[in-house]
């Protein structure tokens, strides 16, 4: 709908330039745009599919556990708003500075983003860990659902801290056109760490949502290590090419 409205405005509004049918065609820039955007789109698609798989693992534990996980997921989505916003703004800011030839400021922005994210992440961590049951209780009055939701949040809580680091690094690499690497490290986290760990924890006797929730911060920590190693490699490669 927004695209249609934009097109109507372009047609009706007096612009300082003209648009013709010939302007809408494939050009050499399209390949570059696809090279940047497709890896991110694929990663996002597979990440969402992994959440469906995680939901299936939890559903094996029964209706109460599934309901608790569903309620906890709402709180998780809210907790991830600030890291996600930092990642998106980081990518734009870094890209502008890289385009201006100011790589030093781009690196500083990544460190600043990590610092800001950690402040909010630690605050959310304490809130979720100490008052997670109160937060879950906002969405469900059932004490068993509240208990199960709180169990998951206790395992997930460290994710609010480590995500602040990972998302700022991901935003930095996105701004430097390293989207293929961003996709690669995301798939490694999801396919090789998060899903196997969550599945393994879900099939244990007396499976705990806390241990299943831990799969998120563990996989994110692996992602941080991978990104640090790639940052060192990429920085050396960039200096050598210059």
Predicted segment positions?
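Helix-terminus/linker motif at the lipid-water interface of multi-pass membrane proteins
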Residues: 45-78, 96-97, 134-143, 202-204
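Transmembrane alpha-helix boundary and packing residues in multipass membrane permease domains
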Residues: 40, 44, 52, 56, ...
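Small-residue-rich hydrophobic transmembrane alpha-helices
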Residues: 68-132, 163-185
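Interfacial/gating helices of multi-pass transporter permease domains
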Residues: 29-36, 40, 57-77, 143-150, ...
